[in-house]
Regions:
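Conserved nucleotide-cofactor-binding alpha/beta core module
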Residues: 1-86, 93-101
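A charged, well-structured terminal subsegment
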Residues: 101-113
Length: 113
């Protein structure tokens, strides 16, 4: 598991715990979108999970460069990325009721709450 952090670590305990679980932790603060996309591609991930999506600090320009074959939107914001490069969104019925599923640009994968 590789993680890329674009916002700069504030030394939070949670961040440190997650970093210990990863094989690779990429500190991308100050990197351009193209540089970060290249760093991700070098690691050849099968799936890239975007936890920021539309929130502050999101890496939309990097995601738009499709640095992994499959990109998944999850957790950061209960909304669609609106982009064509994000393939799936992990959602539950509280975030996206089935009758509203067409508002997402991604294919939806429903998970249990």
């Amino acid at each position: 598991v590789s993680l890329a952090e674009a916002g700069g670590s504030r030394g939070e305990t949670f961040t440190q715990r997650i970093a210990r679980l990863c094989d690779t932790w990429v500190h991308a603060e100050g990197a351009t979108a193209t540089e970060l996309a290249a760093q991700i591609r070098e690691r050849r991930p099968h799936v890239l999970v975007d936890l920021m999506v539309q929130t502050r600090g999101a890496m939309q320009e990097t995601i738009a460069q499709k640095p992994a074959p499959i990109i998944v939107n999850y957790l950061g914001c209960p909304c669609t990325s609106g982009g064509r490069t994000t393939d799936y969104a992990l959602v539950d019925v509280g975030v996206l009721p089935p009758e509203a599923r067409d508002v997402f640009s991604e294919a939806r994968v429903y998970v249990d709450s």
